[in-house]
């Protein structure tokens, strides 16, 4: 970094901000590894509130809150990352769903997302490095002891096991940790033996 200054070792990171109409969007920063200094480099304004970001290789996957209730809002946006610049590569929606997290499988040919509000885990094929559409949906059917807040499933987090053989989803509404096996075409099958309730 710096044409006429001493070369610095920097890492790049991005932050999503709900904010107002003026400052809602994605901020890109440099982090000077040598001294910990953070330098704001760019801002990309967005109409919707970014909820979660997942950078995989040269692409970043963002989930947006559907604040309008319209079927075309919300969804997942895929950006190509070029240093601190982002270029929209693909965008998918699914009847206005708001997804709160995405993960990619080891081969990066399928993405998975969770919908807290509707209790769903969805499969998204990736072709020629771009997300295509929601191809499969697993509707979770959990519930637990709180008669108001736990009447239905609310998935809150997901990740792959370290060996990438199982997708783990935590369900706040069902007080459950659910393990899924990934099929050849991205389909998810619940592993009843490994999954467990917390209460």
Region locations from a protein language model:
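Short coil/turn segments that connect the beta-strands within blades of beta-propeller domains
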Residues: 10-11, 56-58, 107-109, 163-165
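Asp-box/WD-like beta-propeller blade repeats and closely related beta-sheet repeat scaffolds
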Residues: 86-157
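Conserved beta-strand position repeated across blades of beta-propeller domains
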Residues: 52-54, 103, 159
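Short loop/turn segments immediately following beta-strands, especially the blade-tip
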Residues: 29-36, 79-85, 123-133, 181-188
């Amino acid at each position: 970094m710096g044409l006429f200054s001493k070369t610095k070792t920097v890492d790049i990171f991005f932050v999503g901000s709900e904010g107002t109409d003026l400052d809602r969007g994605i901020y890109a920063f440099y982090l000077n590894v040598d001294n910990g200094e953070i330098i704001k480099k760019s801002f990309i304004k967005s109409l919707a509130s970014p909820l979660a970001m997942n950078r995989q290789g040269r692409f970043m996957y963002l989930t947006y809150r559907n604040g309008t209730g319209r079927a075309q809002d919300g969804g997942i946006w895929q950006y190509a990352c070029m240093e601190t610049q982002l270029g929209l590569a693909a965008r998918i929606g699914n009847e206005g769903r708001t997804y709160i997290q995405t993960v990619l499988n080891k081969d990066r040919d399928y993405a998975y997302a969770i919908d807290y509000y509707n209790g769903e885990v969805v499969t998204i094929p990736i072709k020629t490095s771009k997300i295509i559409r929601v191809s499969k949906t697993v509707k979770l059917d959990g519930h637990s002891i709180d008669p108001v807040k736990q009447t239905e499933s609310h998935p809150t987090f997901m990740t792959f096991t370290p060996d990438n053989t199982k997708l783990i989803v935590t369900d706040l509404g069902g007080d459950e940790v659910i393990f899924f096996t990934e099929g050849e075409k991205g389909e998810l099958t619940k592993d009843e033996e490994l999954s467990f309730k917390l209460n």
